[in-house]
From Swiss-Prot:
This is BTB/POZ domain-containing protein KCTD8. The gene is KCTD8. InterPro entries: BTB/POZ_dom, H1_KCTD8, SKP1/BTB/POZ_sf, T1-type_BTB. One of its GO terms (biological process) is protein homooligomerization. GO terms for molecular function: identical protein binding. SMART domains: BTB. It is found in: Presynaptic cell membrane; Postsynaptic cell membrane. Pfam families: BTB_2, H1_KCTD8_12_16. Residues 1-36, 326-409 are annotated as: Disordered. The modification Omega-N-methylarginine is found at residue 80. The lineage of its organism: Eukaryota, Metazoa, Chordata, Craniata, Vertebrata. One of its GO terms (cellular component) is receptor complex. Residues 330-346 have a biased composition (Basic and acidic residues).
Amino acid sequence: MALKDTGSGGSTILPISEMVSSSSSPGASAAAAPGPCAPSPFPEVVELNVGGQVYVTKHSTLLSVPDSTLASMFSPSSPRGGARRRGELPRDSRARFFIDRDGFLFRYVLDYLRDKQLALPEHFPEKERLLREAEYFQLTDLVKLLSPKVTKQNSLNDEGCQSDLEDNVSQGSSDALLLRGAAAAVPSGPGAHGGGGGGGAQDKRSGFLTLGYRGSYTTVRDNQADAKFRRVARIMVCGRIALAKEVFGDTLNESRDPDRQPEKYTSRFYLKFTYLEQAFDRLSEAGFHMVACNSSGTAAFVNQYRDDKIWSSYTEYIFFRPPQKIVSPKQEHEDRKHDKVTDKGSESGTSCNELSTSSCDSHSEASTPQDNPSSAQQATAHQPNTLTLDRPSKKAPVQWIPPPDKRRNSELFQTLISKSRETNLSKKKVCEKLSVEEEMKKCIQDFKKIHIPDYFPERKRQWQSELLQKYGL
């Protein structure tokens, strides 16, 4: 700053920029006066006071956007600027040009005027106010960049930030890779479920969540040692924000790390309750299971050598939820049909309950993969191609019984099989109770089928000979 003497004996404070411009020789200014272009009333380096914040920039930077408010204020060729010369613009006590706007947000406006690019910090909380500043300075391109970031309810949407575009693009590419991997894992062809339709999407995303707490015990007298209870001051939650909000919901305190994107990670959330078992129940209901835990004692200072400081520790529990595939109702219905067909095939191939042990052994021997390769191929074709965590298989896969050392008689096996088939057919025929007349007719038919031979062999048992003598045969 410098003092400029006036004719009345007073003095005026000038900025450094004007002091530099006024230090030029009078001959040079006189030589420039008769030229076709008059010198600009504004210095090359302009000092601005925007809402109490001082900014120093070039005059050409303020004129970089022709139709803006700043260009009309500092351009002498424009109609508005021609009427408003340098002396007519408001100044502060140190003769700097004063603009009554938000001084903190003007830095982003000035940064945009330099290179026509918007670079905001991550999770910028005042995008709506910056939009108002851009509208005031009539920066149409900046307004277009900021407009998608503000919703109709005047709530901030972090996904539209230009500074976060790289994160969104990387996240979108990772999601695309996950979807491609899931699509590649689904088998295709006639054996695939769903007939080549759209596979299930991963609704519940996998991830880790860590619960940490510093626990101690309540201090009581020595004669009440059995009355020491666990005391948990706060349960910390670390992991992805989307998973933490999904599991704990409103019981999650986000005051230490607000305005964070769901796909980001945090280690500053904590729960509003202090019951570990309640947190475990919520994690279990959400499909998480504990994979690791660790604990360590916390050292106390010498002047804090108390029981609650000695018996204190820090513990962490790490929970994980594996990826799960959501199956559509149509695909689930087809899976059930497929399971029924598989169950029927396995039961028909391994039904030995009604037969004896020898028949079961002979059946397993006769149906080995070596003797009947077609049945083995058919059984393997019915087995499901993929196993999901949503619905476990109803029955274990069929295991082939190794053949015995000695082959049993195949005739016995055939007779037992034929008898079992006849009994099954007879049971199916007699499905309802017969009437009295039908029972009598059946008895007469059975009696007529009895055939008494005319001649008995001489070789007979004692009871047989007694019966023949009794009836005189």
